[in-house]
């Protein structure tokens, strides 16, 4: 009888150990899932911050500064023609160069 009791007692202990091992594996899996979810949420938050940061600082292209007004386009063309003719017919006089620079009209008004 003692042997049967010991055997039953050993089986109960083995069952309890198996249950404890299962519990620990479930807890370990739950921790890993929580860690994965937290890290993915952190990555999403960082990506959103990066997108917001990019939106705050606009990047300018040379096309942003091209004027579409006909009068300004004519002034730019005249200045380009005068500078090319001045470089072709360079005689060293500063008056001619200063005259070509004063004909250029630039709009420096900033708007938001």
Swiss-Prot record:
One Pfam family per UniProt: NPR1_interact
Subcellular location, principal: nucleus
Skewed-composition ranges (Low complexity): 77-89
Keywords: Coiled coil, Nucleus
Cellular component aspect of the GO annotation: nucleus
Inducing factors: By salicylic acid (SA) and BTH.
Family listed: Belongs to the NPR1-interactor family.
Known partners and oligomeric status: Interacts with NPR1 C-terminal region.
Protein name (database record): Protein NIM1-INTERACTING 3
Coiled coil: 1-35, 69-96
Superkingdom in the source lineage: Eukaryota
Record localization: Nucleus
GO process terms (BP): regulation of systemic acquired resistance
Annotated stretches, region: Disordered: 1-20, 77-112
């Amino acid at each position: 009888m003692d042997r049967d009791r010991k055997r039953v007692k050993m089986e109960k202990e083995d069952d309890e150990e198996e249950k404890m091992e299962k519990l620990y594996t479930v807890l370990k899996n739950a921790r890993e899932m929580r860690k994965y979810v937290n890290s993915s949420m952190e990555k999403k938050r960082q990506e959103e911050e990066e997108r917001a940061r990019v939106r705050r600082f606009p990047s300018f292209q040379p096309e942003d500064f091209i004027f579409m007004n006909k009068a300004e386009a004519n002034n730019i063309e005249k200045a380009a023609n005068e500078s090319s003719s001045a470089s072709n017919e360079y005689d060293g006089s500063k008056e001619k160069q200063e005259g070509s620079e004063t004909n250029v009209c630039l709009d420096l008004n900033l708007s938001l």
